[in-house]
């Protein structure tokens, strides 16, 4: 049932008496909405439990009205949006246009790029617009849809990073076993999206749009979590489960997988006779590969740890909202969408070769087929490619030492574990 305005004012005054003075001064707009004639308008359509939930959320900070702060945030988030879209769209374009890059591993890379594009388009702008306008302008339906899209894209990104790590682990640790087929890759990606949807639905369902009269001419809205009773425990354990599924578990799997891969690559011996120059080149490549693996783990851990801990502490009521901290942590987490294309593609020599080939095709007319030189194929494709044609295998063997050709083995030091080409 609806609560009489007199009782609301009485309860509000009781809550104010228990709050610290600075908390009230941080919420001038909300205080105005909850006093006097505005109170009856604000709570006309809400129950007593709605009022309790809303008052509980008043402790979690207010919006900054500083134009300089808003301008800086717009510039900072625009930087992420531009670079993330450019990098991830280009990754998808290069992989789709090049038949040689169509593999299960490439599907995972594309899925990661799609998830990062979703984060860029559906997470960053909603957060920024809500802060700049100090109100929710997207309507009741988008209050639920945006929350679902935000969490779903984050789960897809984390799960895809985990799938890539597991795939690389299988390739390096068991090089003679068949690679994951494209069909299985599609199935794994479908499972990732189903899991992400399942994990994201509670966040989408437990959202509510609160509307209040800010002034005589302005009505503002807030899209807030609205959990069933006991709301505090529900919120706390939901965020705890999200923290484990979205951060701790993927980080553990990625760390273990890449640690084993790095150890395998570092300890493996070169097959056949090699010169000192070749040995030093292979050693440098080992170091570069291990550094890339460490970079993947460190960036994932550093980018997402602050925001996840902040949200978990907030839902546990251990801290109050601090806008400066929130947007610093949020920006840092969102910036991972710019790093992923760089780590998984730009640092990979094969991807750069394919990108240059694609750009050269766009710049000048292509030569007749008989005049083209065959593209170099990495030596490790001989052992791992499922459907190797005779010509490609012969070309690959041309680059291998004679001892390797006779043994049919592959030198693990020549493998790039985060390669997008299979």
Curated annotation (Swiss-Prot):
Cysteines joined through disulfide linkages: 143-223
A Pfam family recorded for this sequence: 7tm_1
Residue ranges annotated as Extracellular topological domain: 18-70, 128-143, 206-236, 314-326
Segments on the Cytoplasmic face: 92-106, 167-184, 258-292, 348-422
Chief localisation class: membrane
Region Disordered, annotated ranges: 401-422
Alphabetized PROSITE patterns for the sequence: G_PROTEIN_RECEP_F1_1, G_PROTEIN_RECEP_F1_2
CDD domains: 7tmA_GPR83
Sequence intervals crossing the membrane: 71-91, 107-127, 144-166, 185-205, 237-257, 293-313, 327-347
Protein function: G-protein coupled receptor for PEN, a neuropeptide produced from the precursor protein, proSAAS (encoded by PCSK1N). Acts through a G(i)- and G(q)-alpha-alpha-mediated pathway in response to PEN. Plays a role in food intake and body weight regulation. May contribute to the regulation of anxiety-related behaviors.
Induction annotation: Increased in the prefrontal cortex of rat chronically treated with amphetamines.
Signal sequence, start to end: 1-17
Any Gene Ontology biological process: neuropeptide signaling pathway
Annotated tissue distribution: Expressed preferentially in brain, and its neuronal expression is relegated to limbic brain regions, particularly in forebrain.
Sequence similarity: Belongs to the G-protein coupled receptor 1 family.
InterPro entries: GPCR_Rhodpsn, GPCR_Rhodpsn_7TM, NPY_rcpt
Entry membrane topology: Multi-pass membrane protein
Record's keyword terms, sorted: Cell membrane, Disulfide bond, G-protein coupled receptor, Membrane, Receptor, Signal, Transducer, Transmembrane, Transmembrane helix
UniProt GO MF annotations: G protein-coupled receptor activity; neuropeptide receptor activity; neuropeptide Y receptor activity
Annotated GO CC locations: cilium; non-motile cilium; plasma membrane
The protein's name in its UniProt record: G-protein coupled receptor 83
Record's subcellular location: Cell membrane
Biological source species: Rattus norvegicus
């Amino acid at each position: 049932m609806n609560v009489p305005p007199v009782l609301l004012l009485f309860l509000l005054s009781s809550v104010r008496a228990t709050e610290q003075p600075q908390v009230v001064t941080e919420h001038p707009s909300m205080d105005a909405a909850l006093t006097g004639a505005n109170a009856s308008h604000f709570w006309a359509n809400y129950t007593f439990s709605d009022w309790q939930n809303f008052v509980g959320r008043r402790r979690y900070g207010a919006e900054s009205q500083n134009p300089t702060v808003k301008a800086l945030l717009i510039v900072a988030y625009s930087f992420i949006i531009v670079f993330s879209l450019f990098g991830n769209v280009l990754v998808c374009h290069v992989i789709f246009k090049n038949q040689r890059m169509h593999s299960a591993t490439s599907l995972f890379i594309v899925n990661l790029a799609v998830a990062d594009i979703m984060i860029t388009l559906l997470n960053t702008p909603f957060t920024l617009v809500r802060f700049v306008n100090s109100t929710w302008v997207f309507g009741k339906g988008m209050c639920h849809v945006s929350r679902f899209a935000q969490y779903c894209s984050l789960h897809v990104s984390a799960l895809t990073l985990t799938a890539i790590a597991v795939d690389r682990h299988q390739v390096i640790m068991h090089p003679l076993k068949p690679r994951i087929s494209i069909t299985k890759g599609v199935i794994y990606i479908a499972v990732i999206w189903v899991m992400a949807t399942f994990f994201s639905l509670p966040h989408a369902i437990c959202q509510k749009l609160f509307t209040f009269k800010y002034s005589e001419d302005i009505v503002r809205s807030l899209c807030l979590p609205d959990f069933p009773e006991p709301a505090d425990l529900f919120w706390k354990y939901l965020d705890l489960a999200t923290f484990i599924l979205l951060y701790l578990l993927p980080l553990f799997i990625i760390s273990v997988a890449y640690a084993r891969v790095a150890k395998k690559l570092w300890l493996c011996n070169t097959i056949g006779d090699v010169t000192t120059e070749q040995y030093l080149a292979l050693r440098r490549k080992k170091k570069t590969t291990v550094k890339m693996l460490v970079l993947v783990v460190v960036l994932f851990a550093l980018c997402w740890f602050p925001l996840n801990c902040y949200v978990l502490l907030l839902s546990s009521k251990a801290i109050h909202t601090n806008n400066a901290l929130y947007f610093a942590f949020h920006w840092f987490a969102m910036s991972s969408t710019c790093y992923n294309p760089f780590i998984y593609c730009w640092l990979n020599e094969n991807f750069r070769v394919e990108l240059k080939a694609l750009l050269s095709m766009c710049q000048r007319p292509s030569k007749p087929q008989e005049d083209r030189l065959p593209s170099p194929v990495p030596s490790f494709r001989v052992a791992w490619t499922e459907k190797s044609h005779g010509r490609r295998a012969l070309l690959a063997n041309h680059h291998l030492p004679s001892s390797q050709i006779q043994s049919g083995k592959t030198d693990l030091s020549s493998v790039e574990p985060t390669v997008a080409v299979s």
